[in-house]
């Protein structure tokens, strides 16, 4: 496949819908910095990071008095000071850009479309990783868990779910936990659901993204059988949690790993996540290594 063909394929896969979310009214606790003044945004992020003014001032190497004046609106920070505050608050690139906009500065991080020529090398690398991971499933998702790319094994795992869940943008978490999605096939649904929702909550705490909050609320509302309630806190906890699901080849069990671009300075690329699944037992490994001639 040529680079141009790769770009064309990704352009068809990634629609404007993937990068757009309808945001409903969100409570102050989960509000986005989009709707706040600079002082309100800084106080919100301080609260989310559990930092006092003294803590943040020390981390950012600014005086507590100056930070207090910035938060109260009595002083305007320089761009340099604001970036130091953003770094001390551990803000993702998107949120750093928004903090700069709120203060009247231009954002410093680009947000390119996946179809941009500048993204070509990174996306070729992503596709190479997904392809090399075969015959084990692997996929790439954006910040809202919308599907960007997947290898053949991962696509096979989605066969048979409600077609409405496969309309772009395909949300991987919705497709997993929806009653007409993969949920009926997952044998340890309660445990996996608890694990994923906890991870999603951490993502929300990190980004204050109302679209992720809405997704968390939606997923939390999906039913699951009473027989699949979360395990007792007294039960032995394994080293890692695997997802076990029923397939045409029998029960398959996977461990998951998460990979991100460690040096990304583009918002879109920094938010791209690769989810790679490995066999959690020998039976699953042998079944997948036998080839892709049989459907999963």
Regions inferred by a protein language model and the residue ranges of each:
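A short, Lys/Arg-rich alpha-helix, primarily the initiator
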Residues: 14-49
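Conserved hydrophobic/aromatic packing and binding residues within compact polymer-binding modules
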Residues: 42, 56-57, 67-70
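Alpha-helical residues within the helix-turn-helix
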Residues: 47, 58, 87
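Recognition helix of helix-turn-helix/homeodomain-like DNA-binding domains
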Residues: 61-76, 86
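Short amphipathic recognition helices of helix-turn-helix/homeodomain-type DNA-binding modules
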Residues: 80-83, 87-119
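Hydrophobic protein-protein interaction segments
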Residues: 118-119, 127-136, 141, 148-296
């Amino acid at each position: 496949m040529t680079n141009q063909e790769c770009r064309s394929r990704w352009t068809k896969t990634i629609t404007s819908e993937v990068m757009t979310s309808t945001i409903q009214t969100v409570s102050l606790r989960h509000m986005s910095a989009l709707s706040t003044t600079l002082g309100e945004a800084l106080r919100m992020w301080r609260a989310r990071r559990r930092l006092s003014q003294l803590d943040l001032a020390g981390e950012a190497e600014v005086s507590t008095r100056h930070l207090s004046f910035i938060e109260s609106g009595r002083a305007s920070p320089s761009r340099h000071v604001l970036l130091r505050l953003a770094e001390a608050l551990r803000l993702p690139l998107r949120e750093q850009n928004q903090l700069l906009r709120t203060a009247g500065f231009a954002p410093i991080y680009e947000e390119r479309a996946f179809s941009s020529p500048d993204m070509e090398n990174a996306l070729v690398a992503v596709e190479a990783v997904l392809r090399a991971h075969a015959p084990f499933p692997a996929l790439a998702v954006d910040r809202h868990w919308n599907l960007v790319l997947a290898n053949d094994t991962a696509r096979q795992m989605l066969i048979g779910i409600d077609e409405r869940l496969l309309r772009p943008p395909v949300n991987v978490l919705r497709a997993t936990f929806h009653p007409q999605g993969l949920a009926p096939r997952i044998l340890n649904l309660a445990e996996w659901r608890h694990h994923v929702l906890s991870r999603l909550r951490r993502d929300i705490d990190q980004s204050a993204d109302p679209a992720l909050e809405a997704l968390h609320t939606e997923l939390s509302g999906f039913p699951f059988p009473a027989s699949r309630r979360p395990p007792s806190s007294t039960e032995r906890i394994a080293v890692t949690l695997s997802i076990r699901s029923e397939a045409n080849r029998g029960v398959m069990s996977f461990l998951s790993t998460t990979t991100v671009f460690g040096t990304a300075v583009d918002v879109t690329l920094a938010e791209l996540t690769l989810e790679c699944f490995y066999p959690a037992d020998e039976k699953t490994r042998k079944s997948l290594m036998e080839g892709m001639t049989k459907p999963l």
